[in-house]
Amino acid sequence: MRFYTDYLTFNTEKHREYINITPEVESALRKSAIREGMILVSAMHITAGVWVNDAESGLLADIDAWLEKLAPFREDYRHHRTGETNGDSHLKSLLVHHEVIVPVTNSKLDFGPWQQVYYAEFDGQRPKRVIIKVMGE
């Protein structure tokens, strides 16, 4: 089995943002030259997440509204006693998880017809990283 590692580094423009990173994941897969296996995509920050879903703007707005309903910003989070003000960002990241694993078949991401990889930022406007680890033959 072979392994290939790549990192994405970017600055998000907004405090909360959803970025389709599928092209970058596909680029890492091409660089790896791995034909069969799996690819791990993981946010390297505790207030961010990675998910697989449809790249449709209405759905992204629905996801954002759902996350805000389940984990709204509040002054009274215990985490804020540490001097931080991002308790809701931590909770939102728990809801979407921080990583995904995608099968690789014939040197391609083995997705359904609408699936895309998204990076979800909940405490942005500063440098962030994502690790991409390709494993296989």
Annotated model-derived regions:
Residues 1-137:
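Active-site histidine-anchored catalytic micro-motif
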